[in-house]
């Protein structure tokens, strides 16, 4: 065990640099705003800075931990299920995994509290069932080779059809649920399952089908919540603004964070437990992994646990109040339009601090053998999230319905999926669920809510929906990246015969005569 920990130290230093590169730009933007056009109290500023430090250390531990534990666990379970060639086992285990992972997701409790007209346990069980069913569908799609765009057309048509019967006050919360339930705990494991399943297939489309699980798992919660909204006539949602902290000295600052720490210690333990138990059962029954590999996975799980606890503590206690207060200050100024470019700038950088984005970018680079680099993927995600936050701020300032953005956005994204290479489509729809993680929920959403309070808007209809917008735009930007790559490849191929002819002519002697 000591050897494993020592060997991981160089990797921790590497992950620390990555975390600093992700979080420092956000901290710099907020500090510039605080010392210029959006003054905040020392309490909020100190909480934000300590929160940023915890997020940096949290990302460092989580990214290495997920690489050492969640990814190999998911890949081995996925490979084992595929090798079994037992359809009933795949369906049963797939549903159970989706259900248990989702039911323990901390953000699902937050979503349930926002919809008082639906009993909490009813909503949680329904959403978990939705994820379980759609994870099974995702497995079957991969095994049967069903094109992802075909399924997306059917499911999103059903979503927008149901949306016509749901009270407008409930729409934004319902669409947010798709991003909320694919959190940093579930995404790495689910994506690794997909890689494990496709690795057993030997056909040429196996790599294309490595992704797409998160895409379909994001559909289940939206459908489940929309159906509940119709059944329970959920015309009301609630909003509890975050408490703005007041600390007098450094001791009170530490007490504020240490009091919240036990909550996240318990939440992450609850989230991690079903995955560990399921993997333990697979290990005893079928996997039989050697002790050294198990030790590495165990150390990785500890890193993952420490990382997520630190990350969520820093994000919820440090970032959430700062985001809300900044939104109120910026929205209360005469030049409210500044919310749009500032929101876009923050959105561009904040997605780089999403824990699961690191896992996605790394898996994309590995599965494509470097054809899609982590840097290229990150740039496409940043552009998408930047656009989505800008549009979200337009909604806050104008009160435009979220459907005016979601319907054209999804229509365009699904339309181009029929001409874009399959792999890019699957990655794009996975990226939507990955990008809308805890940083969106704890900073971007409070920023929009604070601005909405300042402009006197309806928080439930105008501010909620940021998560849904963030989940939508990467579908477009990543696929456009794929379309550009495809056009470049075609252009290069068409130019190749001309180059070959030129080379042939160059080899001929000067006095050669070619008769036509």
What are these regions (language model features)?
Residues 1-19, 23, 74-88, 202-213, ...:
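Intrinsically disordered, low-complexity non-transmembrane regions of multi-pass membrane transporters
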Residues 2, 138-153, 169, 173, ...:
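Juxtamembrane and boundary regions of transmembrane helices in multi-pass small-molecule transporters
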Residues 14-22, 46-52, 80-88, 148-153, ...:
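Alpha-helical transmembrane segments and their helix-start/interface "positive-inside/aromatic belt" motifs
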Residues 32-46, 66-74, 100-115, 134-146, ...:
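Transmembrane helix-loop junctions in multi-pass membrane proteins
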Residues 46-47, 65, 112-124, 142-157, ...:
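Transmembrane helix-loop boundary segments of multi-pass membrane transporters
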Residues 78-80, 87-158, 336-417:
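Helix-loop-helix junctions within the multi-pass membrane cores of secondary transporters/permeases
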């Amino acid at each position: 065990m000591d050897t494993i920990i020592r060997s991981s130290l160089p990797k921790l230093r590497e992950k620390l640099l990555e975390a600093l590169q992700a979080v420092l730009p956000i901290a710099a933007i907020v500090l510039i705003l605080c010392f210029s056009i959006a003054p905040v109290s020392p309490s909020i500023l100190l909480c934000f800075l300590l929160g940023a430090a915890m997020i940096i250390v949290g990302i460092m531990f989580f990214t290495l931990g997920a690489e050492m534990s969640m990814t190999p666990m998911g890949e081995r379970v996925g490979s084992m299920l595929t090798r079994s060639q037992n359809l009933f086992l795949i369906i049963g285990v797939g549903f159970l995994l989706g259900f248990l992972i989702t039911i323990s997701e901390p953000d699902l409790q937050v979503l349930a509290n926002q919809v008082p007209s639906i009993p909490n346990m009813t909503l949680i069980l329904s959403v978990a069932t939705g994820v379980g069913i759609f994870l099974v569908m995702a497995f079957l799609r991969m095994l049967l080779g069903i094109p992802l765009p075909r399924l997306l057309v059917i499911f999103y048509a059903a979503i927008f059809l149901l949306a016509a019967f749901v009270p407008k006050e409930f729409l934004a919360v319902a669409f947010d649920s798709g991003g909320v339930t694919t959190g940093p705990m579930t995404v790495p494991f689910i994506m690794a399952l997909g890689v494990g399943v496709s690795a057993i297939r030997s056909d040429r489309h196996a790599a294309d089908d490595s992704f797409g699980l998160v895409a379909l798992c994001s559909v289940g919660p939206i459908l489940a919540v929309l159906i509940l909204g119709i059944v329970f006539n959920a015309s009301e949602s609630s909003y509890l603004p975050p408490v703005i902290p007041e600390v007098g000295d450094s001791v009170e600052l530490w007490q504020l964070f240490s009091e919240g720490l036990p909550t996240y210690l318990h939440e992450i333990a609850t989230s991690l437990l079903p995955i560990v138990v399921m993997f333990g059962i697979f290990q005893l029954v079928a996997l039989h992994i050697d002790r050294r590999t198990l030790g590495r996975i165990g150390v990785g799980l500890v890193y993952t646990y420490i990382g997520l606890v630190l990350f969520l503590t820093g994000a919820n206690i440090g970032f959430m109040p700062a985001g809300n207060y900044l939104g109120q200050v910026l929205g209360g100024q005469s030049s409210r339009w500044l919310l749009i470019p500032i929101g876009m700038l923050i959105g561009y950088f904040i997605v780089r601090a999403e824990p699961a984005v690191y896992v996605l970018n790394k898996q994309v680079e590995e599965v494509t053998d470097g054809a899609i680099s982590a840097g290229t993927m990150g740039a496409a995600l940043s552009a998408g999230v930047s656009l989505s936050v800008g549009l979200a701020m337009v909604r806050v300032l104008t009160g435009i319905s979220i459907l005016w953005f979601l319907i054209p956005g999804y229509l365009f994204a699904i339309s181009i999926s029929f001409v874009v290479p399959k792999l890019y489509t699957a990655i794009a729809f996975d990226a939507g669920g990955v990008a809308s993680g805890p940083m969106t929920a704890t900073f971007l959403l409070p920023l929009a809510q604070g601005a909405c309070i300042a402009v006197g808007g309806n928080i439930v209809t105008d501010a909620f929906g940021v998560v849904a917008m963030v989940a939508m735009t990467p579908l477009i930007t990543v696929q456009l990246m794929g379309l550009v790559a495809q056009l470049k490849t075609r252009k290069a191929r068409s130019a190749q015969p001309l180059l070959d002819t030129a080379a042939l002519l160059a080899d001929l002697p000067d006095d050669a005569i070619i008769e036509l």
